[in-house]
Amino acid sequence: MVDNLEPLEPSLQNLVEQDSLKWIFVGGKGGVGKTTCSSSLAVQLSKVRESVLIISTDPAHNISDAFDQKFTKVPTKVNGFDNLFAMEIDPNAGLNELPEEYFEGENEALRVSKGVMQEMINALPGIDEAMSYAEVMKLVKGMNFSVVVFDTAPTGHTLRLIAFPQVVEKGLGKLLRLKMKVAPLLSQFVSMLGMADLNADTLSQKLDDMLRVITQVNEQFKNPDQTTFVCVCIAEFFSLYETERLVQELTKCGIDVHNIIVNQLLFLQNSHDSCSMCASRFKIQEKYLDQIADLYEDFHVTKLPLLEKEVRGPESIRSFSENLMKPYEPKAKPKE
């Protein structure tokens, strides 16, 4: 009987101890504390993994604020840590953000291939954003981090991120099928401009290499031993609704999800000591916590507190991250 089963551990300890994981996504509705949770998870992982990378794919780039340190599109070591790195990417940048070295070649024609690829990719709806992720994935895989944590944008962007390997596989497949038709035209065009012949094979080899990496990533994303998703929510109707939608979409995409963080909870020790608003909020949260318990009885549900002060800076995150590993218990108030 299901009722006789022990409830799952209410923490993220299961993820930290699963050393086969390569990709961990953290996402949910805007304003629920995803960045604090993803940063805290990365800190805990850094205790047991050789090297950890946290990537922000949210255009707001809150991990710079969370760690109180400026990050860029290049992995940078987080202050106070030896093996934790962070980077921020713009998911809307597409190929414009790719490094120039990627397009370097022996002839001048190859150097114009960036513009050619951009035009070809623009003809395939939805692939521009996906290609940005694709190149990041290629770079990240080459760096051999033990585990990568994604601090994702609000739900809509997140679902596109999850789907990007399939989008890129389809798009690159189309590009490669088109190459034999397009290459002769390009060769004529560049010869008219007095440039050297365009080496179409060199260009298509780059696409082939990227497709190989993306196919590999796509397989890993659908492997629960290597990829999982952590949903972050608060105990309110709209957040719970968004979480259920996200869980269903992830399941449809074949992405593993078995951890939910409920953030910003009130832990009232004595209802007589609380103000009427706190008592009211506490009752509302209790109602939605009961619904979460019913909906996600086969999930690890981690409950995190609403704090008096914001969580900012490496030491503050390090301290808060302990709440991911063992259930939060409010400190007893000193007697007056």
UniProtKB/Swiss-Prot annotation:
Q: Per UniProt, where does Zn(2+) bind?
A: 275, 278
Query: Cellular location of this protein?
Result: Cytoplasm; Endoplasmic reticulum
Keyword annotations: ATP-binding, Cytoplasm, Endoplasmic reticulum, Hydrolase, Metal-binding, Nucleotide-binding, Transport, Zinc
Q: Which GO terms describe its molecular function?
A: ATP binding; ATP hydrolysis activity; metal ion binding
Which parts of the sequence bind ATP? Answer: 29-36, 236, 263
Q: Which InterPro entries match?
A: Anion-transp_ATPase-like_dom (IPR025723), ATPase_ArsA/GET3 (IPR016300), ATPase_ArsA/GET3_euk (IPR027542), P-loop_NTPase (IPR027417)
EC primary class:
hydrolase
Q: Where is the active site?
A: 58
Enzyme Commission designation: 3.6.-.-
Q: Which GO terms describe its biological process?
A: tail-anchored membrane protein insertion into ER membrane
One Gene Ontology cellular component term attached to this UniProt record is: GET complex
> Where are the membrane-spanning stretches?
none
- Stored Pfam families: ArsA_ATPase
Similarity-based family: Belongs to the arsA ATPase family.
**Entry-linked NCBIfam families:** GET3_arsA_TRC40
Binding partners and assembly: Homodimer.
Its function?
A: ATPase required for the post-translational delivery of tail-anchored (TA) proteins to the endoplasmic reticulum. Recognizes and selectively binds the transmembrane domain of TA proteins in the cytosol. This complex then targets to the endoplasmic reticulum by membrane-bound receptors, where the tail-anchored protein is released for insertion. This process is regulated by ATP binding and hydrolysis. ATP binding drives the homodimer towards the closed dimer state, facilitating recognition of newly synthesized TA membrane proteins. ATP hydrolysis is required for insertion.
The protein depicted here goes by the name ATPase ASNA1 homolog
Origin organism is Drosophila yakuba
From the broadest rank down, the organism's phylogenetic lineage runs: Eukaryota, Metazoa, Ecdysozoa, Arthropoda, Hexapoda
